C-alpha cells in the first residue's frame, strides 16, 4: 500500500454499484455483500433496478444498481447515501450522484464517457470536467480498456470480454476494503464449471482489478471496517422474500399441515411463489394463477380442505383480492395474504419500495370485516412474522395480512439459522367424525370455530359469503343475528391483539 494511501477506520460504510442493466451490477453487489458477511461484517443490501425489462442502453431509465451497507455492528438498513459509488457509464453517474455523500469516492469507467453516451445520459457536457463533481473524490479508470488488455490472449470474442468488466470494478473494491477475492473466485469457478474459459476470464479480470488498485495507487483511500460482534451460530445471507417463504415452511411443519400457495406474479412479491415452487420435496403445492382473484380464491379453496394456505401480492393486487378476502372473513377460514408493498397508487412504482398499504390492509373490504395485520421490520425477521401470521390464522380461524415491502423482500442481511424446536407449536382445531359438530360453535378462549374438512362424515355444513346463523350455520338475513355475528368476528380479532410477540422482535441499534 502506498504511503500516500489514507487508511480510514469506519464503523459503517455504504457502497453503491451502478451501471446499465446487463452490466452485472446485481451480481457484483451481491458478491461484495457475501464477502463482507463471510468476513463478519453486519450487512444490509438493496437491489435497485428499472421496471422496464430492458430500457435503451446508456439511458438513465436503464440504470441498475445495488447498494450494500456494511458495519462493525448488526446493520438494519441499506443506508441513505453512499460513501463509495461505482458508476459504469454517464447514465449511472447521473442517476446516482444525488445518492452520494459529499466527499464520497466515485469510481467511473472512463471508457464509457464518450460524447454519445454523455448525450444519451442527458448531460450537455462531460460531467467529469464539470464543477459539479468538485466536492467528490472522483477516480476515473479505463475499466473496459484494462479488461480488454487482461483478456487479449484469452481467445474470447469482444462481447464476452466486455461482459467481464464488472469483475474489474469488484476487484478494485475488494482492495479498497482489504478483502480477498477468494469467495468470488470460488463462486465463478463453480458457476462456470462447464465453461472453464469464461471462468478463467472472469477470475483473471477480478484479480487484475485488485492488482491495479494496489499497484498504481489510483485509490487515495483504504477503508477498514472491523467484523461485527454477533451472537454465535450458523448464519447465511437471506432476502426477505426467501425468509417469508421459509417461515411458512416452518409453520406448515409445526402445524403438520400441507402448504399451498396460490398467487399471480407481481413485483416485488413473485420470489415467494418461486421459492415455494422449489419445495415440492416438502409437499408444497403452488399454483400460478391467471389473475389476482384466482390466486386468492384457489388459496381459500385449499384452506377449506385443510391446507395452510397463503397468497402473495403487492398493493395493486391486494385491491383486487379484497372481495375474496371478505369471503375468507365471512367463512372464517385460515389464510395468510402477503403484501410486499411497493410505490402506488395504481401501477405506481413497481420496483421501488413504499409502506403505504396499511389502511388498505386494515379497512380495504366491504362491510365490517376485521382482519389481523402483522408487519415485518427486517429481511431476516420476515421468517418470524410469516410463522406467526400462519399460527394466528390457523389457531384463530381467520385470514391474516402480512405486510412486508420491496426493501425487505429484495433486501438481504446475515440471518442466524434458527432451530424449529425454539418455535411454539401450532395446533389446528379440526373437527372429527362423531363430534357434536356445530359450524359456528366457538372456542370460549379464542372465539375460533372448528375446522371441518369436506368429506368427513357428519360434518356437512354450508359455506360461502352469505351471513350465517350463530352456532348452527344456517343462512340468515335477520338483522339481530347479523349484529351478533359481526360482534363475534370483531371480538375474535380483538382477542388476537392481546397476543405478545415481543420475544421475536429484534433490538433497535
Task: Give short role names for the model-derived ranges.
Residues 238-247, 255, 385, 390-505, ...:
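Flexible, low-complexity linker and terminal segments
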Residues 49-50, 205, 226-230, 264-268, ...:
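A glycine-rich phosphate-binding loop feature that marks nucleotide/adenosyl-phosphate handling sites
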Residues 12-100, 164, 246, 251, 259, 341-368, 483-505, 509, ...:
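Thiamine diphosphate
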Residues 133-136, 140-146, 352-405, 425-433:
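Conserved thiamine diphosphate
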Residues 2-255:
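Active-site cofactor/cluster-binding pocket
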Residues 108, 311, 337-338, 402, ...:
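Structural beta-sheet core signal
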Amino acid at each position: 500500500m502506498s504511503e500516500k494511501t489514507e487508511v480510514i477506520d469506519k464503523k459503517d460504510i455504504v457502497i453503491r454499484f451502478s451501471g446499465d442493466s446487463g452490466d452485472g451490477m446485481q451480481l457484483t453487489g451481491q458478491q461484495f455483500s457475501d464477502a463482507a458477511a463471510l468476513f463478519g461484517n453486519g450487512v444490509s443490501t438493496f437491489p435497485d433496478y428499472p421496471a422496464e425489462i430492458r430500457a435503451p442502453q446508456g439511458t438513465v431509465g436503464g440504470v441498475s444498481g445495488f447498494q450494500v451497507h456494511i458495519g462493525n455492528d448488526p446493520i438494519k438498513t441499506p443506508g441513505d447515501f453512499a460513501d463509495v459509488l461505482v458508476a459504469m457509464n454517464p447514465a449511472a453517474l447521473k442517476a446516482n450522484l444525488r445518492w452520494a455523500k459529499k466527499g464520497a469516492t466515485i469510481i467511473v469507467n472512463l471508457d464509457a464517457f464518450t460524447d454519445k453516451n454523455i448525450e444519451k445520459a442527458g448531460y450537455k457536457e462531460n460531467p467529469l470536467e464539470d464543477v459539479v463533481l468538485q466536492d467528490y473524490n472522483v477516480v476515473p479508470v479505463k475499466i473496459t480498456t484494462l479488461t480488454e488488455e487482461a483478456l487479449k490472449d484469452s481467445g474470447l470474442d469482444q462481447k464476452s470480454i466486455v461482459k467481464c468488466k464488472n469483475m474489474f470494478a469488484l476487484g478494485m473494491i475488494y482492495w479498497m476494503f482489504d478483502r480477498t477475492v477468494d469467495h468470488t473466485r470460488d463462486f465463478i469457478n463453480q458457476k462456470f464449471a462447464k465453461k472453464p474459459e469464461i471462468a478463467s476470464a472472469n477470475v483473471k479480470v477480478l484479480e487484475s482489478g485488485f492488482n491495479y488498485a494496489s499497484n498504481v495507487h489510483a485509490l487515495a483511500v483504504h477503508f477498514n471496517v472491523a467484523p461485527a460482534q454477533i451472537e454465535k451460530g450458523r448464519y447465511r445471507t437471506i432476502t426477505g422474500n426467501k425468509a417469508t417463504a421459509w417461515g411458512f415452511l416452518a409453520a406448515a411443519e409445526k402445524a403438520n399441515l400441507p402448504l399451498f400457495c396460490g398467487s399471480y406474479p407481481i413485483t416485488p412479491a413473485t420470489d415467494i411463489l418461486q421459492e415455494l415452487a422449489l419445495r415440492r420435496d416438502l409437499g408444497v403445492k403452488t399454483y400460478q394463477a391467471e389473475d389476482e382473484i384466482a390466486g386468492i380464491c384457489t388459496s381459500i379453496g385449499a384452506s377449506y380442505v385443510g391446507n395452510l394456505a397463503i397468497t402473495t401480492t403487492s398493493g395493486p393486487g391486494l385491491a383486487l383480492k379484497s372481495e375474496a378476502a371478505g369471503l375468507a372473513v365471512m367463512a372464517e377460514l385460515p389464510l395468510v395474504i402477503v403484501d410486499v408493498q411497493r410505490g402506488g397508487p395504481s401501477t405506481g412504482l413497481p420496483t421501488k419500495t413504499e409502506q403505504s398499504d396499511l389502511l388498505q390492509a386494515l379497512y380495504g373490504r366491504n362491510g365490517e370485516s376485521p382482519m389481523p395485520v402483522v408487519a415485518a421490520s427486517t429481511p431476516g425477521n420476515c421468517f418470524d412474522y410469516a410463522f406467526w401470521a400462519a399460527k394466528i390464522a390457523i389457531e384463530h380461524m381467520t385470514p391474516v395480512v402480512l405486510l412486508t415491502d420491496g426493501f425487505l423482500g429484495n433486501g438481504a442481511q446475515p440471518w442466524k439459522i434458527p432451530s424449529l424446536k425454539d418455535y411454539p407449536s401450532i395446533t389446528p382445531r379440526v373437527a372429527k367424525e362423531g363430534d357434536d359438530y356445530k359450524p359456528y360453535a366457538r372456542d370460549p378462549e379464542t372465539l375460533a370455530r372448528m375446522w371441518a374438512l369436506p368429506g368427513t362424515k357428519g360434518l356437512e355444513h354450508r359455506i360461502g359469503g352469505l351471513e350465517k346463523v350463530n352456532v348452527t350455520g344456517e343462512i340468515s338475513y335477520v338483522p339481530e343475528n347479523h349484529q351478533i355475528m359481526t360482534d363475534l368476528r370483531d371480538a375474535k380479532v380483538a382477542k388476537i391483539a392481546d397476543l405478545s410477540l415481543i420475544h421475536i422482535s429484534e433490538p433497535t441499534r
